[in-house]
Amino acid sequence: MAEYDHYEDDGFLNSFNDSSQEEHQDFLQFRKVFLPCMYLVVFVCGLVGNSLVLVISIFYHKLQSLTDVFLVNLPLADLVFVCTLPFWAYAGIHEWIFGQVMCKTLLGVYTINFYTSMLILTCITVDRFIVVVKATKAYNQQAKRMTWGKVICLLIWVISLLVSLPQIIYGNVFNLDKLICGYHDEEISTVVLATQMTLGFFLPLLAMIVCYSVIIKTLLHAGGFQKHRSLKIIFLVMAVFLLTQTPFNLVKLIRSTHWEYYAMTSFHYTIIVTEAIAYLRACLNPVLYAFVSLKFRKNFWKLVKDIGCLPYLGVSHQWKSSEDNSKTFSASHNVEATSMFQL
């Protein structure tokens, strides 16, 4: 949902002179077009990508590792998350017409799945650290790790529900020039911001910095043809997280501590543009955490073949070659046991 909607039009316009009011009206028109369009793009891409990951994970890929457990829960959280975006897109163009119950429900669904996605990303990072740095121990305790992984995922969903209660309880529909779904309470907004910054940014960022630093050090001292590929993927994961999440979280932090920026129309543009960039994670997660796997890509081509699209795509030969290469690749136990991404 639009973070900007908690600070709606009337409050801004009252603090502006005539020139600033004209600029702000231009901004409101820009927001009315830009955010819904971005929401719909993220919705479509996230719906397709995360649905594919879920279908392949459930019907074509047995849960053989802790990473597999996480890669079922992550696209599920992202999928439910993006399914709330069409409602916010419509509300951005017009106003909130779905009532108070739907307001509370969608605020809860949106927030629960946001926290779940970020906490699972943190767990995936820690799991990769264990698989690479403690490879032998991780392999020998695979069954136990699978059990713990399911328990951890259940706990993540419960924790996400608990920390989302303020939005669910205090979420309401307000009439501020138009009907808005949100929470119009400064204390609640402060609590929500602190929780979002901690669980949704600083925790996964800290986990990535610590775990990936050790992983990189371990891989640099290791041999094998997987090293360079794994390092590239690590840097890609870190770069995508930093580029998509840092700007929006930085803007939210500035917004909460420097109220004078509220009189700057340029700052309002920054809020909604960085928000849209942050939501791209729901589209990119399937690529970063699933499609990098050779095993997953093999199962993807199986799905394409089963639904009858393979002959039309003209990739039957390539799919067969990819399948053979994947089988040859997976024959190496040592590589798979120590591979960070189980490629």
UniProtKB/Swiss-Prot annotation:
Disulfide bonds join C103-C181. Glycans are attached at N17. Keywords: Cell membrane, Disulfide bond, G-protein coupled receptor, Glycoprotein, Membrane, Receptor, Transducer, Transmembrane, Transmembrane helix. GO terms for biological process: calcium-mediated signaling; cell chemotaxis; immune response; inflammatory response; positive regulation of cytosolic calcium ion concentration. One of its GO terms (cellular component) is external side of plasma membrane. Coiled coil: none annotated. Signal peptide: none annotated. It is a multi-pass membrane protein. Residues 61-69, 127-144, 217-232, 295-343 are cytoplasmic. It comes from the Eukaryota. The chain crosses the membrane at residues 34-60, 70-90, 105-126, 145-165, 189-216, 233-260, 277-294. InterPro entries: CCR1-9-like, Chemokine_CXCR6, Chemokine_rcpt, GPCR_Rhodpsn, GPCR_Rhodpsn_7TM. It holds the Pfam family 7tm_1. Residues 1-33, 91-104, 166-188, 261-276 are extracellular. The keyword Zinc-finger does not apply. GO terms for molecular function: C-C chemokine binding; C-C chemokine receptor activity; C-X-C chemokine receptor activity; coreceptor activity. It is found in: Cell membrane. Its main location: membrane. Receptor for the C-X-C chemokine CXCL16. Used as a coreceptor by SIVs and by strains of HIV-2 and m-tropic HIV-1. Belongs to the G-protein coupled receptor 1 family. This is C-X-C chemokine receptor type 6. The lineage of its organism: Eukaryota, Metazoa, Chordata, Craniata, Vertebrata.
